[in-house]
């Protein structure tokens, strides 16, 4: 079925609290998508973020980001009084430092009210999520007690989960543990309401999960034996990407690598649980760095660049078979960008999952792969660019003149019309699904870039300040109809 959608991170939504939330503006964006006759809203990972603010480095593979909780909804639900809701602030880029200082104070007031007389909805939530919630809450409480130190720097007894140390921490930090559980209840209550509304409007939520967990995460702390660690929960090998035309030293991500033989011995139980959780909160799930299941780039822990790494065989078809057994064969998007060997292509074909196509890459002379539209298959998802790309207007301004000229020749347009032509090329191509970043529909420049890989500083901060008008929605709808991507219900 041909369909289309828009890529828009939750944090990029407008709103009065310094970051996009799950409140009124999220519901208004669903309305905009429905008027534009879209089928999908693709977001970025929604887990709690830490140093660097990357949603791909979260404290948990299961938890939700407290920054996305909407204060107005908490007040409507009786967990805050109206005068406890902060005064609106102008919509600008996300200031994570301000959120870090303000959010816990206000959320604690709401949590205290909930915990004074826990509701059945809260106790039911805790029971349903017990496979991750208790460990996550204790991890966050301990992290605060340790001055926000990373897991690697915790005292040995806590890092290695000595039973007596954990028992004492549960008693000592009981209030903090309950606070973090309450905050997760608030998040998932609001998330559920948004998803229900979106689905009623015919909009499906496309979630995004990183293949790897963070080195500073409750996931690593809780099950270190599932990762390549020594006996003291220190990493022995870390994840990354080898050098290429875009990064001379490669990319040193620093994430824990999985101990795949251990996962396979457990019939991939942890991954099955992770994916079942993801499919319960999203309608479609994009798995980042999908090729890492066939083989992964392994870098010795402590290396300062990725140049000294090597490729190591992953679980390959055994993992795919386990996911098919647990989830069936639909509802997954495989991010298959980058270095693809014949073995990776064989694994992707066996999975049945659609891969990704990036229209910008088609005209980038540094890109060794062929991303021209004539190479696409129906079972794929096409983007002008993703969160890791500059906007198409930004690409036009920064790409080599030769690349821009080639794109304009191929798409039969002038440079001024390149963004609209690239969008049309995506919508008109054979790929079953087309996803266009919101910033491209608005023809925004490099100031709207979400992330520049291998950099720190101004990433994950862009927010929408341009009004989403009915005129724009109707323009999107017109092209959606023209290229036969209207929702199935129509």
Give the positions of each predicted feature:
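Outer-envelope exported proteins of Gram-negative bacteria
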Residues: 44, 204-206, 210, 284, ...
